[in-house]
Amino acid sequence: MERDFSGSPRVIADLGRIIDRLEALGRLVRVRSEVDPRHDLAGIAARFEGGPQAVLFEKVAGHAYPVFVGLYWSRELLGALFDQPETALPQHVAASIKSWQSAPVDPLVVADGPVLEVTEAEVDLSTLPIPIHALEDGGPYFDAAVVIAKDPETGVRNASIQRFQVIGKDRLVINIDAGRHLGLYLDKAAARGEPLAFTLNVGVGPGVHFAAAAPAEAAPVETDELGIASAFHGAPLELVAGTVGPVEMVAHAMWALECEIRPGEVHAEGPFAEVTGYYARVEPRPLVRVKRIHRRRAPIFHTLLSGAEVFNSVGLLGEANVLALLRVQVPGVEDVYFSHGGCGFYHCVVKIAQKRAGWAKQAILATFAAFPPLKMVTVVDEDVDIRNGRDVEWAMTTRLDAKTGILVIENAFGHGLNPTFPNYLGTKVGFDCTRPFPHTPAFDRAKTKAMTLDGLDIVGAKR
């Protein structure tokens, strides 16, 4: 007997319904010509990157399933999906995480789900339309799939997003960022002489992605991060039990792969064009064995481009965490923004209405502590538009005292994908671009009267 899933769950929890919603809003482009998943698909997608529409490739050469890209490359698009102004997204995300922290809603394990509609008789990753994006990438990559694993000692679930290179019909290689809970789980399993089982969930909603991207500072190791997805959905996230392993799968995913990593098994991985705009180097990394593949009857493969899509997924979670912590620790903080020029999580601009001298530097230190991948923090006054690079540069050139306003922190932990942080250690810098406190008229911005052009007789104007 088949279960009817047509009325469940909320739109935000189901990728198929998300795509339908985007199309209804006029925010979906359909590419109906056949496209080669090796380089061509990414090259076409890049022409739309950062725009207000996502892209669905209906015909992928050599494959039976479509590919979707662009869910996260525009905050305007994300805002439309969440019914939020794009500038309010960090506050919306922060509020959802705070709701989870104060009243956690555990995921619900159900008996069945769309992801179990088909279980492949044979494990063959070549049947999935996994693209090769950049010209020098080492092969096809899963780059938008969510890993669910369990602590071998406590059984607590963890969600994360890692990159996986396909190297065979049933083999992958995983890159695990340093400091991630998944790496801790792998070490614990190896110490016990056991494989680490996990599931790889493809085509999930933003709530699950945001749960997976939540910084460790927001979701400590003893908590089940998947509850964050429940907070975004407004209802418990539905999971289904694994069929060959002990780890659950997202019930409404498009695909779910049951996998394991055995102690000591490694394989060369890379290169891969990362969010920094550089290729991650080839290194030996953990080998993954795929034990079983489940999918919907008509699945859609979700991929993302390493760029704006990472800025607006991982970066948005970073913004939300920094904003929530700064508002508690530093009086006067009004807003934060992770700039796209800073790869979405290396440069944070903080807006503050200073109440006391020295609080801008306090904000710099607190921001670095709230999100360790950051390399640079710039603090500006409340009269500066933090999302306007020209305005931030204006504050830097006219308000920064280069002798007293630059804070340099050497040998600090950072992000391994940033080439200036080899082995995760490097130098961080903070810029106090605020007016001297107490304020004087010398640093007041010149203003003109706010006027409307409505009703005026104007000829030849172009706006």
UniProtKB/Swiss-Prot annotation:
InterPro entries: UbiD, UbiD-like_C, UbiD-like_N, UbiD_Rift_dom. Coiled coil: none annotated. GO terms for cellular component: cytoplasm. It holds the Pfam family UbiD_N. GO terms for molecular function: carboxy-lyase activity. SUPFAM superfamilies: FMN-binding split barrel, UbiD C-terminal domain-like. It comes from the Bacteria. NCBIfam families: UbiD family decarboxylase (TIGR00148). Belongs to the UbiD family. This is Uncharacterized protein in cooM 5'region. It comes from Rhodospirillum rubrum.
